[in-house]
Amino acid sequence: MKKNITRRDFINGTQVAIGTAVAAASTTFISPWMDVFGAELANFTLNNDYYPPAENGLRGSHDGSWENMHLRVMGEEWVVDNVEEEYDLIIVGGGISGLTAAYLYRKTYPDHKILVLDNHDDFGGHAKRNEFRHGDDIRIGYGGTEAIDGPSTYPAIGRQMFEELGIELDQFYEAFEQDLYSKRGMGFSIVFDEEQFGETKHVTGYGQKSWEDFAAEAPLSDKAREDFIRVQTAEDDYLEGTPTEEKFRILQKTGYSSFLRDYVQVDEQVINIYQNWGMSFWTVDMEEVPTTSVQYYDGGIPGVDHTLPKRAGRGDEPYIFHFPDGNASIARLLVRNMIPGSFSGSTMEDIVTAKADYSMLDRSDNQLNLRLNSTVVHVVNTNQSAAVDITYVRGETAHKVRGKKCILACYNSAIPYLCPEMSEEQKAGLAHCVKIPLVYTKVLINNWEAFDKLKTSFVYYTGGFYKQAELAYPVSLGEYKRSQTPDQPMVVHMCHVPLFKDITGPEQWREGRRQILATTFEEFEQHAKDQLNQALGEAGFDADRDIEAITVNRWPHGYAYSNGLVWGEDFAEEDKPWVIGRKQFGNIHIANSDAASSATTQAAIAMAERAVKEITG
C-alpha cells in the first residue's frame, strides 16, 4: 500500500528558513556608525521553534542557500552605503574550518567580538546533521562529513581542541559495535546490472563466501569468472623485476582499471565490477584513480598487494571514530563552547541528543554571533586598509558590516567574486579548486529485516543512480542507542556521484554540479525507492510500505579539489594553485579545506590554525 513519505522541501528556502524564523531581539548591538547615519539595525534572532536538522526533503546546499552567490557570479551587485555593525573579526563560513578559526582566535583574544556569517540555514557546513522521528524514537544520520578518519593524522592543535571539547577518542572503541553486523553473518553484496552483465542479479557474500562460490553465482562469462577468481587469489607480481620505487611511479599514473586491463589482463566484465567501486571516496571512476591509491582505501579492491608492497592505509586505525551525525557533533561542540545557552550538557555523549537552541546564536550580548541564512557577496579591504567591509544578503535585504580582520572559510571558487580587487594570479589559484559534487541520501526505513534475511549490510551497485545502500554505523553514545534488532527503524545511507563516461578532469565536476542542481527531490526519491526494491525486494522489502522518510543532502560543491588522480599535476610547493590562492590579502585571510586541496576535517582544522596565526602571530 502506497503512503506519503515525509519530505518537507525547501523549494522556497528563504520563505521557510528566513521569512518565518527571524524574530525581534530583546536588545541590539548598536555600532557607532548607526548614530552617524541614523539607520535602524536589523534584528537577526531566530525563533525558538527554528530547527533545521529535523527537516527532510532537499538539504545540504538547500534552495535558498546558493541562489544569491550564483547571481553574484553572473554579475549582480548589492550596494549598501551604511555600515550597520562592527566586529573585531568576521568569519565567512560556519563550517568546521570557520568555527575552528573562531575557537582558536578566542584563545588569544577572548574579549573580542566575532561575527560568523553562513549562507545555509544551519551551521556546520558539510558536517550536516539529519534527524528522523519514528514515533517516540529519534534516528540520527550524517548528511556530509562522516567521521574523524585517522585521528593520529590530525594536527596537534586539532587533537588538543578535541580534548578541550571533551571528545575522548578511546570511547569510540566501546561506542562503535564493530562486529554487530558480522556476528549476524551480514557483509558485502553486489547488485550486477543488466546492461553490463546481461541480467540484474543481487549476489551476497562478497569476501565471505569462497571466491569460487561467489563467482559461480555472479552473472559472468566463463572467461570473466575465471579471471575474477584469479585476481582475488593469485599472488603474482605484475611488474616483476621492476624496482619498487619505479613500480610506485608507474602505478601512480596508472588508473586501476588500466592496471587490471593492461597488467593483470582480465576480462572487461571484471573491470566493470570495480569501475565505480570507490565512487563515494574518489568521486570518479577507477580509470582516474591511481593504482597506488587503492591500497590506501582498504575497501576490498584486489590484485595490487603482491605487485607493490603496501605503504599505508585507512586500516592503520579502525574506522570507528564516528558520531551518529558524523562530524556535525564537532561543530555542535564548538558552538556549545563559544555560545552560552546554545546547547545543554557538557560531554561528548550528551551532545548527540542535545537539541540546539538556535535563538541563542545571534543575540546582541554574545561575544560570538553566528548568523545563518546570510550569503556574503562582497569583501573589501577599506578604511585606509585598517578594516574589511563585508556585504551580505539575507532574504531580499543586503547588509554591510565591518571587521578589523576577516577570515574567509568559504569555498575557494567563490572568493574571486567576493574579492574582485585581488590579483589575477591569486584569483587563478583560487579558481583552480573545482569542488566535487555528490549527494548523500538518507532513507529512514521502519525495519531492516530484509537486509538481515539477505545477510548484507552494504549493497554495492555496478550500475544505477546510487552507488551504494549501507546500514548506519552501529554507534551508541549517551542516551542515543543504535538500532538494536532488525525489527527496529534504521537509517540507510545512499550515495550518488554524477558520472560521465566521456568527460574527465575538473570539467566532469562542473557538469555534475549542473546536473544535481537540476535534479528534483522526486527524482532522487524515486531512484532510492527503485534501487532498494531492486536489492531487497526478494526478501520482502517494499519501498512504499517500509520507507518512512527521505532526506537528500545535495552538495553541488562537495569535496575539496583532489589533485591526487592520474591526471593530477606535479607542482613545487610554492607553485601549488591552492598555496598561491590562500595567501593573506590585506586584512583578509583564508581558511578552508580547499586551501589545502584536501577534503578532510584535519585539513579544515589545519587551515583554520594557519589563518588565525596570520592574525595573531
Model regions and ranges:
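Active-site/ligand-binding neighborhood in enzyme catalytic cores
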Residues: T233-S374, S385
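Mid-domain catalytic core of redox enzymes
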Residues: L368, L372-H493, V497, I503
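N-terminal glycine-rich phosphate/pyrophosphate-binding loop and immediately adjacent elements
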Residues: W66, V73, E77-F248
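Conserved beta-strand->loop/alpha-helix structural units within folded catalytic cores of enzymes
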Residues: D88-T100, L117-H120, V376, K405-N412, ...
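Conserved flavin/dinucleotide-binding core of flavoenzymes
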Residues: E40-W78, G187, L444, A450-G617
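N-terminal secretory signal peptides and thylakoid transit peptides that target proteins
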Residues: M1-A21
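Glycine-rich active-site loop/strand segments that organize a redox cofactor
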Residues: L46-N48, A54, G125-A156, T292-G313
